C-alpha cells in the first residue's frame, strides 16, 4: 500500500470515491476549458472523470510524483497524458504542450499533509500557471481542517485567490471530503 510506503505523497487511506471525483469535475465545468492540468492523479480516479468530460479540442496533461501511480493511471486511462514529474514543474509542461497558462488546474495533492514551505511553493506555482479568471479545484479531507497544515492551506487560498468556494461534503468518501473551487 502506497500510504505506508510514501505517506506524504499519497496522503489518503483509500482512492478518492467516484462521488467526490464526479463532484470536482462537475464543479470545474470542463466543457468550456481550453487547457486542463491535473496534479497528483494518484491511481487515476479523477483522470477517468476528466477524460470522460473534456472536449476533444482541450489540452490535458497530469503530473504525478509517484512512479507506481503514474503507471497505474496510464493503465487505467490510456488516452491520458501522464508525466512522472513534480507539481512544481507545471510551467515546464505547459511549455511542452505549447501553452502559456492553464484555465483549469485540478488537484488531488494532499495539501493537508504538506510542510508549509512545500505548500507555499506549490500554491505559488499553481497560481502563476493560471490565466486571469482561471480556476483551481482541489479536494480537501474533512479531518484535515482540524490540523495546522489544513487550516494554513485554507487561509493561503483565501488570501491568494479572488474567490474561494467550498462544495458540499461527500460523506461517503473515506475519509469524508469536499472541493475547494478557487478563481484567480
Residue ranges and their predicted role:
Residues 120-132:
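A short glycine-rich, Lys/Arg-flanked "PGG" loop and its adjoining helix->strand segment in the class I
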Residues 132-140:
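Conserved beta-strand signature within the Rossmann-like core of class I S-adenosyl-L-methionine
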Residues 154-184:
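Class I S-adenosyl-L-methionine
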Residues 32-42:
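Conserved class I S-adenosyl-L-methionine
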Residues 66, 86:
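Conserved SAM/SAH-binding beta-strand->alpha-helix loop
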Residues 44-48:
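Glycine-rich SAM-binding Motif I of class I
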Residues 1-31:
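Class I SAM-dependent methyltransferase Rossmann-like catalytic core
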Residues 73-74:
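Conserved SAM-binding loop
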Amino acid at each position: 500500500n502506497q500510504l505506508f510506503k510514501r505517506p506524504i505523497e499519497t496522503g489518503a487511506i483509500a482512492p478518492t470515491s467516484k462521488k467526490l471525483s464526479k463532484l470536482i469535475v462537475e464543479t470545474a465545468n470542463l466543457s468550456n476549458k481550453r487547457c486542463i492540468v491535473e496534479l497528483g492523479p494518484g491511481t487515476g480516479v479523477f483522470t477517468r472523470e476528466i477524460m470522460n468530460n473534456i472536449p476533444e479540442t482541450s489540452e490535458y496533461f497530469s503530473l504525478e510524483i509517484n512512479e507506481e501511480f503514474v503507471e497505474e493511471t496510464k493503465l487505467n486511462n490510456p488516452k491520458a497524458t501522464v508525466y512522472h514529474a513534480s507539481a512544481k514543474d507545471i510551467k515546464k509542461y505547459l511549455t511542452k504542450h505549447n501553452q502559456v497558462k492553464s484555465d483549469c488546474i485540478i488537484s488531488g495533492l494532499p495539501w493537508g499533509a504538506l510542510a508549509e514551505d512545500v505548500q507555499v511553493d506549490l500554491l505559488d506555482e499553481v497560481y502563476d500557471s493560471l490565466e486571469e479568471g482561471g480556476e483551481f479545484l482541489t479536494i480537501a479531507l474533512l479531518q484535515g481542517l482540524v490540523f495546522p497544515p489544513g487550516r494554513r492551506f485554507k487561509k493561503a487560498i483565501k488570501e491568494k485567490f479572488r474567490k474561494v468556494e467550498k462544495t458540499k461534503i461527500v460523506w461517503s468518501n473515506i475519509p469524508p471530503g469536499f472541493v475547494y473551487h478557487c478563481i484567480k
